[in-house]
């Protein structure tokens, strides 16, 4: 019985912290393309210093931009 209460309490605390944190979701979607602007300033040294996860994100951005489904909302 105690373990069920503990699990429910943990779940509620995670949900509250997720949905009521001011930084959990962006206030507006106007800044969605700032990451694309940041990619313009990359040089070879930046790419060599990147972590593998950063390279995966760059690859995802490139695939999205090459995709036919991507629409520019600006």
UniProtKB/Swiss-Prot annotation:
Q: Which UniProt keywords apply?
A: Antibiotic, Antimicrobial, Secreted, Signal
Secretion signal: which residues?
A: 1-24
Q: What family is reported? A: Belongs to the non-disulfide-bridged peptide (NDBP) superfamily. Long chain multifunctional peptide (group 2) family.
User: Which organism does this record belong to?
Assistant: Tityus costatus (Brazilian scorpion)
| Protein's recorded name | Anionic peptide clone 9
Question: What GO cellular-component annotations does this UniProt entry give?
Answer: extracellular region
Q: Where in the cell is it found?
A: Secreted
Output the superkingdom of the source species: Eukaryota
* Annotated function: May be an antimicrobial peptide.
Question: Please, one GO biological process term?
Answer: defense response to bacterium
Report, as the record phrases it, the tissue specificity of this protein: Expressed by the venom gland.
